[in-house]
């Protein structure tokens, strides 16, 4: 599905990603953890080819990748409905307003209002809802739980699990360890641009203990 080989990225001479290697398979959910500035968002932006990088990234179906940025952006004077319609048209998907309305019964968004006037949580819900209306083989979600209320988190987790059942590949980042252990098959910890630990079948407490050891080692150097 997605293979990353020797991925490196520098900004103004500073190394942000250092020889990263991953293999992400279909039908699995992958979590990426790391402190602020560890390189998580840069990794995702490289996967989406929004950044230049050294190394190789190969994707089975490069035109069927969905992406949720950690910083929602909307043009001025575009309503929630217009944003959805624009994204669907860009993906050559027919607009089914009945389907949109039915899905919005769960999200409860004022689609007639300008999206720039939405709260951060509402903007995040609008972007997630738009992704749900499209058919992707690979979905990359950068801090998707940030700004969501409990209902939004539940809806998002249900959708992620559904995509896994459909054989999709999902990669997401979060600072909330339990949010990842609840749904992820594998979790990686990035520190200073390097993957320093991988976890499978570990509880949130076990991962926190392991990460604490790494953090103490790094701060003592």
Pin down the residues of each PLM region.
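Conserved structural motif at the start of ABC-family nucleotide-binding domains
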Residues: 2, 17-19
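The feature captures the beta-strand-to-loop junction immediately N-terminal to the Walker
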Residues: 33-35
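Q-loop/switch helix immediately C-terminal to the Walker
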Residues: 71, 77-91
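Conserved ABC nucleotide-binding domain
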Residues: 103-119
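Catalytic Walker B motif of ABC-type/P-loop ATPase nucleotide-binding domains
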Residues: 139-143
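Helix N-cap at the start of a conserved alpha-helix in ABC-type nucleotide-binding domains
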Residues: 150-151
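H-loop/switch region of ABC-family ATPase nucleotide-binding domains
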Residues: 173-175
């Amino acid at each position: 599905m997605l293979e990353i080989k020797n991925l490196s990225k520098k900004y103004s001479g500073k190394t942000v990603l250092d020889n990263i290697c991953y293999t992400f398979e279909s039908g699995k959910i992958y979590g990426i953890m790391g402190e602020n500035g560890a390189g998580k968002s840069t990794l995702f932006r490289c996967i989406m080819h929004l950044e230049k990088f050294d190394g190789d990234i190969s994707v089975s179906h490069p035109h069927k990748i969905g992406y949720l940025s950690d910083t929602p952006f909307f043009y001025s004077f575009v309503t929630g409905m217009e944003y959805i319609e624009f994204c669907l048209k860009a993906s050559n998907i027919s607009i089914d307003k009945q389907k949109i309305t039915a899905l919005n019964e769960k999200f409860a968004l004022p689609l007639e209002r300008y999206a720039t006037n939405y709260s951060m949580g509402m903007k995040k819900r609008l972007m997630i809802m738009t992704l749900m209306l499209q058919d992707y083989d690979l979905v990359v979600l950068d801090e998707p739980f940030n700004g969501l209320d409990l209902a939004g988190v539940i809806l998002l987790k249900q959708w992620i699990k559904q995509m896994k059942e459909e054989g999709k590949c999902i990669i997401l980042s979060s600072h909330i360890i339990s949010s990842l252990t609840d749904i992820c098959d594998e979790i990686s910890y990035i520190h200073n641009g390097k993957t320093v630990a991988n976890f499978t079948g570990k509880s949130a407490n076990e991962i926190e203990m392991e990460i604490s050891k790494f953090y103490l080692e790094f701060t003592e150097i």
